[in-house]
Structure formats: C-alpha cells, structure tokens
C-alpha cells in the first residue's frame, strides 16, 4: 500500500482526517448544513437509508467533487438525518419534535456569512476566518442538555441515536477517522495500551490484494453531562443534574 501511495503522490495525505460524522434532527437543519458545507466546497454525494439496519436515520456524505479538490482535502462528513416518523411511541415522537423545534444549531454570524458567500460567490480572507470560528460552534460538544434526565432516558430506550440527536443542543461530531497503512497494527496497538476497542476489525480479513475499506475504533466514551432539571421554579437560573452520555468514539 505504501508503494502505491508513493507512486500516486497520496502518501502525504495519509495523516489527514478522512471521515467524520454528524447527526441532524430536522430537514431545516439539513438544508442549512448543505449551505454551510457548500461554502467549503463540499457537496452531498450518495444516499443511504439505514432504517433496514435498525438505525432510524437516512444519510448522505458531504465532500469535494473534483479530483484536484479531493487531492488537497479528501475529508468527508457523513451526515445523518433523524427519522422522527420511526419513533413508535406517538407521545415521545411529539416531545422529540417539539424539543428539536426549539433549538438553533447555527449562530447568527455563520448564517450571515453563508448568505454573503451565496450573494458574492465567495468570502474574503477575513470573512473566511470568521466563518470557521462561527461554524465551529455548530459542531462543538455541549456538556449541558436541553432535556430532563427522564426524557433523555425515554429517548435512549427508543434508540441511543435518538437520544444523541434530540437530547443535545447541537450535532457534535461523533467520530473522526484517520487513515493508516496497517489497521491490524492499530487494532493491536489499542489493545496493548488498554484502550477499549471494537472486538474485531470491520470488513474483510487481511488479504494479499487491495481492499477498499477495513475499519476499527475505540469504543464510545462515557462522558459526564448535565441534564436540565424539569419544573425549575427559578426561570432566570437553569439547574442541571449530573448524568452520563455515551456516543462519541474514534
């Protein structure tokens, strides 16, 4: 593989992030996310319905389209939209819909810069720098949730992914995937260092021929979060109770 990458000039891209993933809650969020990614020259490619696999989302991947851009940055973001219609409990479906309707995952600043980009066909260097800072707010981790622990638990019981989308203020990046020349060595290295990893490498076994994709990761981390206290008497001061959430992995 190394010889092939040296021959094609791709070896320098080996250390680049190749793949990330986010999960969205509404069609409006997906529409604005499409516009946000377009600023960076990334466009939706492919359609994946994960419902037959028991995952209540359908997805696409945002990435560059032409070979020159892909050579400079092969990064793609697998973007999933929650299928609220697949929540069996009608009351829970309504609560989830209402919760998502109340959140805004994009800053005013990033929306303004997207509109400037669309109107003038690009951004200045200063605007581009500001755009990156504003966009980071959309993807960052929030350790305080907009839902009470009881609602979070009901969402979790429906499906962990439902809780991960509805239970948080934004679509935190749930994993990033680098590329390696030897994934077997990565798997063994994680296990040797006591890092909990997937039991097996996903994909075909090692073979004496090129393989499109084999992947592994460390297991999702249990992270401390604060759940919003329901029926808080002091509306001017939000209270939170401690809990945990498990979703982000790598």
Report the location of each language-model feature.
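Extended, well-ordered protein cores
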Residues: 1-250
């Amino acid at each position: 593989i190394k010889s092939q990458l040296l021959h094609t000039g791709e070896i320098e891209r080996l250390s680049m992030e190749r793949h990330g993933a986010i999960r969205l809650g509404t069609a409006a969020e997906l529409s604005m996310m499409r516009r946000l990614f377009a600023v960076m020259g990334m466009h939706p490619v492919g359609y994946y319905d994960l419902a037959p696999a028991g995952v209540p989302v359908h997805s696409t991947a945002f990435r560059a389209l032409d070979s020159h851009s892909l050579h400079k940055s092969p990064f793609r973001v697998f973007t999933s939209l929650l299928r609220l219609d697949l929540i069996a409990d009608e009351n829970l479906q309504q609560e989830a819909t209402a919760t998502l309707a109340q959140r805004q995952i994009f800053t005013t600043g990033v929306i303004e810069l997207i509109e400037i980009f669309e109107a003038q066909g690009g951004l200045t260097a200063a605007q581009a720098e500001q755009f990156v800072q504003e966009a980071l707010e959309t993807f960052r981790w929030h350790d305080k949730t907009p839902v009470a622990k009881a609602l979070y638990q009901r969402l979790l019981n429906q499906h962990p992914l439902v809780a991960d989308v509805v239970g948080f203020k934004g679509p935190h990046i749930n994993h990033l995937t680098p590329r390696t020349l030897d994934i077997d060595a990565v798997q063994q290295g994680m296990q040797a260092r006591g890092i909990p990893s997937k039991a097996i490498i996903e994909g075909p076994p090692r073979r004496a021929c090129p393989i499109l994709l084999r992947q592994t990761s460390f297991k999702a981390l249990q992270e401390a979060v604060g759940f919003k206290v329901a029926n808080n008497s002091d509306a001017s001061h939000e209270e939170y109770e401690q809990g945990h959430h498990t979703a982000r992995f790598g």
